[in-house]
Regions:
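Conserved N-terminal alpha-helix of the aminotransferase class I/II PLP-enzyme fold
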Residues: 1-12, 16
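Short active-site oxyanion
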Residues: 2-3, 27-28, 143
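PLP-dependent aminotransferase-like
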Residues: 19-107, 114
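Active-site region of PLP-dependent enzymes
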Residues: 110-116, 123-199
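Alpha-helical elements of the RecA-like P-loop NTPase motor core of helicases
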Residues: 15, 40-41, 90, 155, ...
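Short, conserved catalytic or interaction motifs in soluble domains
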Residues: 9, 55, 82, 133, ...
Length: 199
């Protein structure tokens, strides 16, 4: 993808992604019933209600059941790629586009997996990874990463993960050394030690 940013953990990655997409109280987010608690935790922490779709024969989101769960409160879909496999992203993206929904991939258990020669994390609007030691690519403690090709979403996620702050460019083109809090955010950065270990 064009853009990526390190965050504190995979749960934060999902929550930051949801908030960047404008998900909040009164909204619903569709995900699969076969997932770890953090997927649902992120949805609830964003203020939304999780709605579940059953799995297919590969224990991944059954995209054939997806459209029946969509209503006027639905804001996003979180397909969960598991066991090194990718969900049926062609069908999921088609349904999302038809209904004007964001697709946020949960890639915590699919590092390196591909779908039609594209890696997971590059198939939806946003990809969210976890580097917890039990994951396919584990760090030395918690860590997470977010990927996207959308600069607007990337800029918003950069602010959210750093206490809602941004730096302003001066007319000279140089960055002003001061930070400005422009929205609500959190403190969730991938620290240098974990990043260095994973390199």
């Amino acid at each position: 993808t064009k853009y990526g940013l390190g965050v504190g953990n995979g749960t934060d990655a999902l929550e930051i992604a949801l908030k960047a997409c404008g998900v909040g109280p009164g909204d619903e987010v569709i995900t699969t019933s076969n997932t770890a608690v953090p997927t649902v935790t992120a949805i609830v922490n964003a203020g939304a209600k999780p709605c579940f779709v059953d799995v297919d024969e590969f224990y991944l989101m059954n995209s054939n059941l997806l459209e029946n769960k969509i209503n006027n409160k639905t804001k996003a879909i979180i397909p969960v790629h598991l066991y090194g496999q990718s969900c049926n992203m062609k069908n999921i993206n088609k349904i999302a586009k038809k209904n004007n929904l964001y697709v946020i991939e949960d890639c915590a258990q699919s590092h390196g997996a591909t779908y039609n020669n594209k890696t997971t994390g590059s198939l939806g609007d946003i990809g969210c990874f976890s580097f917890y030691p039990t994951k396919i690519l584990g760090g030395y403690g918690d860590g997470g990463f977010i990927t996207t090709n959308n600069q607007k979403l990337f800029d918003k996620m950069m602010r959210i993960r750093f206490l809602g702050m941004e730096r302003k460019k001066m007319s000279s083109g140089h960055w002003n050394g001061k930070y400005y809090a422009v929205e609500h955010g959190t403190n969730s950065r991938l620290d240098e030690v974990h990043a260095a270990i994973m390199l």
